[in-house]
Amino acid sequence: PASGCVIPLIPDGLSRGRREIQNLDAAAARSFVTAAASFLEKQVQQDGSFRYGYYPRFDRVIPGYNCMRHASTIWSLLCQYRITQKASVLSLAARSIKYLLSHALVYRDPDTAYLSEPLKDEIKLGGGGVLILAITEYLDLCSEEPRPAILRSREPLTKAPNAEIFHAKDVLPEQEALRRRYTEIACALGNGILSLLNPETGEFSHVLNMDFSLKERYRTVYYDGEAAYALCRLYRLTKEEKWLFYAKKAVDHFLAADYTRYRDHWVAYAMNEITRYIHRDDYDTFALRNARVNLDFLYKRETTYHTFLELLMVTFETYERILAENPGLPYLKEFDLPYFLRTIRVRADRMLNGFFFPEYAMYMRCPDKILGSFMVRHDGFRVRIDDVQHNIGGFYLYYKNYSRLLALGMPKDIPCEEN
């Protein structure tokens, strides 16, 4: 709004103190994505690392660093690029990839790589997964962009590349060299994931020491979905059957162990991807159940928990494809579409309680620093790069699919008591 305008604020309820968004449409969702992604752009430092985050009440910097969260945040920058086509965003993503490859990529042998956490002296399964996602998404956009920011390195593959960013006049040869090199790195990371997979059970080991010995067999369920999704994206990139074969092993374990109980958005991403290539009723059913059996919990959750909208929106994309490709699926009769769509609308509105509007930011020590970002209210209004990332992911998919959501019956508005 123009300076001097009076903006009415919601007087009570969960959304007390923020402006009411009368029409949370595609344009509104786009504005939240671009604002939050612009915040992330400002966090990219000269060496490609991010300013990790803040506790903004007292403008305290969050200590430490997490390379896995760094990798997944690159994905959010690329969502911004898909919307705005700003070349500077692609360059920032390139710089951020360079940082990881220079500081955190480790090789067990010439064909097997991992993303390490140097400050923790450990290797996480999920780290390799999200770095594959960042690389494959970046390569997708480079193939669409006529003059991308190229990362070039003459280092041998057995060493972490020391890349530099430049704009090439002769784009096509450089672009092809980039694609080959980054495909090699992504495949080496994929082999790292496979080294942590039990092919008999489909279970992953989660954390290694820096000498590649096992540190923790299990840490968090998120790693499983990240790894399976990454294997599926490697299949999309290379068309090598082995990636899909082993992704199937992991997904079979998700079904056998009923991973719907975890309400995991990464599992939703993995199922959305694998059902593009493997057409089985049990896979389609599980992909839909992963959201359906959790709708009551997602609908009633009062916090802004940032991965829930991602889970719902990824499942929406899966639902649409199943409806077109497998309309006879028996579970479609059990899938409560109106409740599902209503839950999406409620969660999208609930997420706004975590957006740093000016009326929230003004209470923080340095409002300008966190304006337009997303926060975690129940942890001191924390603003961390991965918090912003997940909010961008959910709203980007909401923006992308908004017209289809309305066409299938999502309400434009929700009752005020649900705000």
Question: Where do the language-model regions lie?
Answer:
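Solvent-exposed loop and edge beta-strand segments that line ligand/cofactor-binding
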Residues: 7, 21, 56-71, 111-128, ...
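Extended, well-ordered alpha-helical scaffold segments
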Residues: 24-40, 85-103, 144-156, 163-164, ...
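CBM-like carbohydrate-recognition segments
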Residues: 65, 279-282, 300-419
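Low-complexity, Ser/Thr/Pro/Gly-enriched N-terminal "stalk/linker" regions
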Residues: 1-68, 92-95, 103-111, 159-165, ...
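Well-ordered alpha-helical scaffold segments within catalytic/enzyme domains
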Residues: 11-26, 71-88, 129-148, 162-179, ...
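Sec-exported extracytoplasmic/periplasmic mature domains
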Residues: 41, 45, 78-82, 105, ...
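Solenoidal tandem-repeat scaffolds enriched in leucines and small polar residues
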Residues: 192-244, 248
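Acidic, Gly/Ser/Thr-rich repeat motifs that build Ca2+-stabilized beta-propeller blades
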Residues: 93-94, 128-130
